[in-house]
From Swiss-Prot:
It is found in: Nucleus; Chromosome. Keywords: Acetylation, ADP-ribosylation, Chromosome, Citrullination, DNA-binding, Hydroxylation, Methylation, Nucleus, Phosphoprotein. CDD domains: H15 (cd00073). It comes from Mus musculus. GO terms for biological process: chromatin organization; negative regulation of transcription by RNA polymerase II; nucleosome assembly; regulation of transcription by RNA polymerase II. One of its GO terms (molecular function) is dATP binding. SUPFAM superfamilies: Winged helix' DNA-binding domain (SSF46785). The modification Phosphothreonine is found at T18, T146. Residues 1-15 have a biased composition (Low complexity). This is Histone H1.4. The modification N-acetylserine is found at S2. Histone H1 protein binds to linker DNA between nucleosomes forming the macromolecular structure known as the chromatin fiber. Histones H1 are necessary for the condensation of nucleosome chains into higher-order structured fibers. Also acts as a regulator of individual gene transcription through chromatin remodeling, nucleosome spacing and DNA methylation.
Length: 219
């Protein structure tokens, strides 16, 4: 009885240890997947851009650069090849030598500049939109300035007719004076002709006096 009793509790101990190991393995695998970092395509483009070789970067040199960056090249060899093919098909990389994933690769300057230009254009358009609103205000101010100039110009036009009217008025008195001067000598001439007419009745008065004298003689 004493021999069989201690054997029973020893059996469940190894059964408890096995699930702990499985959990630890799962956690380690999950940690590796999480710390994988950026995608392969980004790492490849960075490695190609960093190289100064004119002929391009070979696959072996690419793998070395990726390994130096901390990327597991041996496990992700197929991913590197697929990433290279996709980058070549997109136009971000240009294959200078070889075919497929093997060969040497170079950054496509046109594609890189094309990606940079739209960003620069958007930033430039955003900057240009802001001064456009500010530029509208000076236009309004310019419109008011032109209106002020037009109002200033109009009195000048009004002054010219006034000056012309003044000049005409100044000229007209001269004419009036001339007419008055011409008319003035005529009136005394008329008066001179009238005076001899008034003298004629004086000659008729002696004629009426003659009959009075004859009547006195008859008496």
């Amino acid at each position: 009885m004493s021999e069989t009793a201690p054997a029973a509790p020893a059996a469940p101990a190894p059964a408890e240890k096995t699930p702990v190991k499985k959990k630890a393995r799962k956690a380690a695998g999950g940690a590796k997947r999480k710390t994988s970092g950026p995608p392969v395509s980004e790492l490849i483009t960075k490695a190609v851009a960093a190289s100064k070789e004119r002929s391009g970067v070979s696959l072996a040199a690419l793998k070395k650069a990726l390994a130096a960056a901390g990327y597991d090249v041996e496990k992700n060899n197929s991913r590197i090849k697929l990433g290279l093919k996709s980058l070549v098909s997109k136009g971000t990389l240009v294959q200078t030598k070889g075919t497929g994933a093997s060969g040497s690769f170079k950054l496509n300057k046109k594609a890189a500049s094309g990606e940079a230009k739209p960003k620069a254009k958007r930033a430039g358009a955003a900057k240009a939109k802001k001064p456009a609103g500010a530029a509208k205000k000076p236009k309004k101010a310019a419109g008011t300035a032109t209106a002020k100039k037009s109002t200033k110009k109009t009195p000048k036009k009004a002054k010219k007719p006034a000056a012309a009217a003044g000049a005409k008025k100044a000229k007209s008195p001269k004419k009036a004076k001339a007419t008055k001067a011409k008319k003035a000598p005529k009136s005394p001439a008329k008066a001179k002709t009238v005076k001899p007419k008034a003298a004629k009745p004086k000659t008729s008065k002696p004629k009426a006096a003659k009959p009075k004298k004859t009547a006195a003689k008859k008496k």
